[in-house]
């Protein structure tokens, strides 16, 4: 019996299902994973903003305008990061006949590492924001310094997230 291409089709579909079942940065799930990463960054940044809103409210009511201004600046930086992440280029749509080259494993590892680093930076920002609230509540330490460190961390995260665009831009042209 001679096999036809239609006979092989179920086997090819099975192999595709196995490969797509891996929920890493595979072709079928790149955009979905990109969306999940961006949602996590936005969620964590929103937590930082919430902590800073609490600091701002308590310090403004208490008459400590210097700390309130620093918290307001941090809230603005959080808003900028949330906006940047929300409007950032989405990861790697790839049409068969487009001018975009396919990502290599090296490209994918670079993107995964970059995404992980951004999430770690935002998590450090959340920890700093929480520490600033704790510092105010216990009257220990310098809350203005901690708020300014939080602002610096979010600002650095914003710049680091912008580098992600360059990683994705490297995939835009075939070489």
Predicted regions and their residues:
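Leu/Val/Ala/Ile-rich N-terminal alpha-helices, chiefly Sec-type signal peptides and the beginnings
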Residues: 1-60
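Low-complexity, intrinsically disordered regions enriched in charged/polar residues
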Residues: 2, 6-9, 13, 31, ...
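Residue-identity detector for glycine
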Residues: 3, 14, 21-24, 28, ...
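Arginine residue identity/basic-tract feature
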Residues: 13, 30, 38, 43, ...
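Charged linear interaction tracts used for macromolecular binding and regulation
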Residues: 51-146
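Preference for long, well-ordered alpha-helical segments
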Residues: 135-175
């Amino acid at each position: 019996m001679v096999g036809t291409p239609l006979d092989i089709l179920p086997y090819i579909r099975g192999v595709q299902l196995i490969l797509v079942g891996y929920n890493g940065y595979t072709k079928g799930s790149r955009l979905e994973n990109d969306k999940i990463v961006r949602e996590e960054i936005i969620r964590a940044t929103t937590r930082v903003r919430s902590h800073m809103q609490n600091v701002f409210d308590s310090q403004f009511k208490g008459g400590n305008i210097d700390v309130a201004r620093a918290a307001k600046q941090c809230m603005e930086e959080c808003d900028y990061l949330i906006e940047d992440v929300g409007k950032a280029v989405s990861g790697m749509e790839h049409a068969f006949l487009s001018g975009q080259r396919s990502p290599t494993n090296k490209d994918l590892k670079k993107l995964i590492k970059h995404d992980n680093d951004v999430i770690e930076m935002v998590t450090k920002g959340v920890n700093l924001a929480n520490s600033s609230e704790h510092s105010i509540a216990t009257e220990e330490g310098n809350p203005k310094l901690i708020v300014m460190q939080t602002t610096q961390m979010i600002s650095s995260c914003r710049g680091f997230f912008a580098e992600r665009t360059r990683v994705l831009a490297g995939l835009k042209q075939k070489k």
